[in-house]
UniProtKB/Swiss-Prot annotation:
Binds multiple chlorophylls and provides some of the ligands for the Ca-4Mn-5O cluster of the oxygen-evolving complex. It may also provide a ligand for a Cl- that is required for oxygen evolution. PSII binds additional chlorophylls, carotenoids and specific lipids. It comes from Crucihimalaya wallichii. The lineage of its organism: Eukaryota, Viridiplantae, Streptophyta, Embryophyta, Tracheophyta. Belongs to the PsbB/PsbC family. PsbC subfamily. This is Photosystem II CP43 reaction center protein. One of its GO terms (cellular component) is chloroplast thylakoid membrane.
Length: 473
């Protein structure tokens, strides 16, 4: 009975809808998958599957290089990046390349170099993909056992997982080294309106870094998305890189424990579903980060966040009316609350009016005007700098609102420009992609579990109703 049970539980079934599984060939008869099922035809052809993945990487890197050069070719240094529909150059600028004080672009050559390097890399990957798809061995197990695998070989699968984790850890440390040793990164909080600087005082305190994970995801807490300190971002990459590398070594050296062998499904489609779930989580987190966070995604490059644009409008009109003689500390608005300033429920002085709901915004142009109890009235009267006025006026008219068909801005704002914020594009696209990846996870997880349990859902293609219907023409 024991043998029967373990066979039933772990018997290796790839989810084919018909046909038998054969090694040779990539057609429907030998694999059970039609041409449009793509890589499913290559489930047991490790060499060809390698070709497909390398070619896919080549396409990704080619897009990055081509789009990078396209943005460089269209870039106008006199306009902010976020007014030009750029999504790649802001990332390069955030890494400290080509920018100076205040986020001003002083050199576009690093951006050109980045584009060319990606194009060259994509050519190498493209060649490798075509080679392995067309010329290389169909399977790697015989000639290159280190790179070969069988999907149900749990030990080999966790070894591959370990290698991937180490590579991810190395990637995290690349950012750390850039910030510490290779020119630094752009810090929007640098005094006077942001600058590129090297990170000098990493505290590495686990209570600080992992404290973010324990925060509530709502309101003034904001979970990990609330990070507003460049040191903490780089420290986080030190911790995460270390965990990934040590976890990778652990998975290479160990075999899966009994509980893991029992709990997980060990098939190619199951691993696909796990990967899709992980990518989905990454997409949703990236969506929240680019929408709310103005430290990892500086507003100088990505435009203001929604709360930031709203608070900037309140600040701009406070500055204007104060110059015209208004007493901003006591003026009443139409609701009886303060017109310019009011108190939050916990007693801080905050901007009044509709923007009161964004009272917990932190932004580099605003923080110098705060005291121990919120906005400081004496600083608002005496200490406002011209750069703060300029920046808030700019952010006020560039709210990340509007539809993705380029009719942007606040509908009632007479000074609005035809503009859609990169934050709108990046957060929307990552939410949508994260959602579709999650649906893909559910789909492939369901199929993988059904196959592992010994039954499969689906139509037998030999008897599809469509085969007996009159052709459309």
């Amino acid at each position: 009975m024991k043998t029967l049970y373990s066979l039933r539980r772990f018997y290796h079934v790839e989810t084919l809808f018909n046909g038998t599984l054969a090694l040779a060939g990539r057609d429907q008869e030998t694999t059970g998958f039609a041409w449009w099922a793509g890589n499913a035809r290559l489930i047991n052809l490790s060499g060809k599957l390698l070709g497909a993945h390398v070619a896919h990487a080549g396409l990704i890197v080619f897009w990055a290089g081509a789009m990078n050069l396209f943005e460089v070719a269209h870039f106008v240094p006199e306009k902010p990046m976020y007014e030009q529909g750029l999504i790649l150059l802001p990332h390069l600028a955030t890494l400290g390349w080509g920018v100076g004080p205040g986020g001003e672009v002083i050199d576009t050559f690093p951006y050109f170099v980045s584009g060319v390097l990606h194009l060259i890399s994509s050519a190498v990957l493209g060649f490798g993909g075509i080679y392995h798809a067309l010329l290389g061995p169909e399977t790697l197990e015989e000639s290159f056992p280190f790179f070969g695998y069988v999907w149900k070989d749990r030990n080999k699968m966790t070894t591959i997982l370990g290698i991937h984790l180490i590579l991810l850890g190395v990637g995290a440390f690349l950012l750390v080294f850039k910030a510490l040793y290779f020119g630094g990164v752009y810090d929007t909080w640098a005094p006077g309106g942001g600058d590129v600087r090297k990170i000098t005082n990493l505290t590495l305190s686990p209570s600080v870094i992992f404290g973010y994970l324990l925060k509530s995801p709502f309101g003034g807490e904001g979970w990990i998305v609330s990070v507003d300190d460049l040191e903490d971002i780089i420290e986080g990459h030190v911790w995460l890189g270390s965990i990934c590398i040590f976890g990778g070594i652990w998975h290479i050296l160990t075999k899966p424990f009994a509980w893991a062998r029992r709990a997980l499904v060990w098939s190619g489609e199951a691993y696909l579903s796990y990967s899709l779930a992980a990518l989905s989580v990454c997409g949703f987190i990236a969506c929240c980060f680019v929408w709310f966070n103005n430290t990892a995604y500086p507003s100088e490059f990505y435009g203001p966040t929604g709360p930031e644009a709203s608070q900037a409008q309140a600040f701009t009109f406070l500055v204007r009316d104060q110059r015209l003689g208004a007493n901003v500390g006591s003026a009443q608005g139409p609701t009886g609350l303060g017109k310019y300033l009011m108190r939050s429920p916990t007693g801080e002085v905050i901007f009044g009016g509709e923007t009161m709901r964004f009272w917990d915004l932190r932004a580099p142009w605003l923080e110098p005007l705060r005291g121990p109890n919120g906005l400081d009235l004496s600083r608002l009267k005496k200490d406002i700098q011209p750069w703060q006025e300029r920046r808030s006026a700019e952010y006020m008219t560039h709210a990340p609102l509007g539809s993705l068909n380029s009719v942007g801005g606040v509908a009632t704002e007479i000074n609005a420009v035809n503009y859609v914020s990169p934050r709108s594009w990046l957060s929307t696209s990552h939410f949508v992609l994260g959602f579709f990846l999650f649906v893909g996870h559910l789909w492939h997880a369901g199929r993988a579990r059904a196959a592992a349990a010994g039954f499969e859902k689906g139509i037998d293609r030999d008897f599809e109703p469509v085969l007996s219907m009159t052709p459309l023409n």
